Swiss-Prot record:
Residues 383-400 form the WH2 domain. PANTHER family: PROTEIN BNI1. Residues 477-494 have a biased composition (Polar residues). GO terms for cellular component: cell surface. Residues 317-357 have a biased composition (Pro residues). This is Arp2/3 complex-activating protein rickA. Residues 312-494 are annotated as: Disordered. It comes from Rickettsia rickettsii. The lineage of its organism: Bacteria, Pseudomonadati, Pseudomonadota, Alphaproteobacteria, Rickettsiales. Its main location: other. It is found in: Cell surface. Recruits and activates the Arp2/3 complex, which in turn leads to actin polymerization, promoting Rickettsia motility during infection. The gene is rickA. GO terms for molecular function: actin binding. Residues 421-454 are annotated as: Central and acidic domains. Keywords: Actin-binding.
Amino acid sequence: MVKEIDINKLLAQENNALNAILSHVNELCKQNKQLQGLIEIQNETKELEKEHNRSLPWFKRFVKTVSNVKYILIKSEEQLTNEAIKYNNKILKDIDNKIYNIAEKSAPLKQALQEEIEKSFKDLTKKDLSKDQRARLSEVFFSYKSKPERFSALHMTNPLQFINAEALEKQFNSLNATKQNIQNLISENSNIKELKEIQKQVAEIRAEVPHTFFEKLNNIWQNVKNVFVNNSEQVLAKNKESNTRTIRKIDEQLYKTQHKFEELIENKERNIKDIIAKLPDNEELQKIVSNLTNHMASKKEPILANVSLAKPLENNIPPPPPPPPPLPDNNIPPPPPPPPPLPDNNIPPPPPPPPMAPVKTLSKAVEATTVKKLENQPRPSIDTSDLMREIAGPKKLKKVEFDPNTGKPVAHSHSKPAQNVNKPSGLESIFARRVAIEMSDSSSSESDSGNWSDVSVNRNKSKMLKTKGERDAKMTTHAQKINNRNSQKPSFVR
């Protein structure tokens, strides 16, 4: 209540200045009376002039009327010439400066002015405006921000109070321009669904301190770039070149703003330390210095970590690694890599293969034995004429009969006469002879002397040489055993 009384007193004192502003608004409406909606605003201006009680509600109505004039002029710019647009912008800037000069004399009135302008802008942007018109409205609407003293009304502690806030004002205006560029980029690529959600986040950044404004805007901008990278196929062909230029421009703006913030923070830190150095030393002051040091260290780390994020997209690609230095001519090649580590279950590696020396010795002994056998004892010749004659001879097929009940073949016994039982057939005798010769040959190869010997006896017994007669008798006995076994088979088995 006390604040409102002070505001009413100030407005009463500034009555002449307010009337001058109303006359400027009225003149602006007359110059653009062909535009739809300005006649109604002109009538509202006349009603405001007739009211002599200049209170806070009256001031809010007055600010809303000026905001409506800006909206109509921006919406109907296509109907105006370039000279008319320049003239209108000049008059609007004069009106804003005069309103701000009155409001800066009272902190409550200045805060009320800012809140009313924000509210009017939020309501007007919901109307039918194109993206270019919305950007122009933002530029015209917040022209009052050209006064750096606006930041003196921020609720900040004394050590962080910026008495001369010109640098912060420049950063804030730069961030507003960057924010508008991001909104325009999102609007131009509205076919990408992911950007619609980010557009809401950008619109929610309002009335921020410059540094927090930058942090929020920078984080959102990284998300926007990620959307473009992951959805490059959805970008329209006509927008690719303009998107590249806009992205590069926004990256440069954020990069410059970030470095400027670093300088401001470092300068403010030095100023605070200079102030503390002049104060008497005590424990509480030491705690403040320690807290300040920790706080500044924590604030600098994320800024430095995000520097690469604010750089253009082309710089985000890491450079290729440098080539390895050339080795000198007399340099020893590097040793082979160490063996791979054991697996998790710690299974030991298989044992190494046994040495090959014994194998080579054995092979040499075998070669020597074989050569010696070939030289000392040649293989006996085998007559294969009987075998070939029996194979080439006529073959008689036997008829196979089947049992009508079971369907299985019936076995017939064709027993030969008793006198022919022990008589071997032609093929059987030939095979028996051949088997006996090969068995005797294999037994002779296993003997150390290379002569024909009996291998069927126990190796522990002393080996004795046999005569040719004994060997022939043994071969005949072995052949008869084979013939007896073959004669005991059924006749239908070959």
